[in-house]
């Protein structure tokens, strides 16, 4: 059993790796559950203070043995939106106070809002927001840059 507290991350991709590195850097205990053995080995090398567990993060027994009900936050960062949402809801049911699923499909954001989850990570929306902020800065100095980008992206920025 993993000690209580800390953050649990489901999935060991780039976002999870970067988040774990940032959390470990400020002294937060991090545990990552990842299916892929090669990814687990890489994570263990790059994140020596993190606890890396190989297994299926949708397995309730595994999550219980990893102490999900005792963690401060649960972040679901797999490549599957449906899996992220279901496991985030499971973590919420276990009593985790802060639960955040990653949603790649923006169409799912309306569904997430119906679940009672506090937060969601939507990489496409984050990138669009960053681009929009950058273009607003250009538009104020160059005039029409914002209109051009808005047209190119089909109005997806705002």
PLM feature segments, named:
Residues 77-78, 103, 124:
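Glycine-rich, N-terminal phosphate-binding loop of Rossmann-like dinucleotide-binding domains
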Residues 59, 80-81, 105:
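Short loop-to-helix capping motifs
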Residues 56:
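Conserved acidic residues
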Residues 1-45, 49-50, 61-73, 98, ...:
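Cytosolic regulatory domains of K+ homeostasis systems
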Residues 53:
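Conserved Rossmann-like nucleotide-binding pocket used by diverse enzymes
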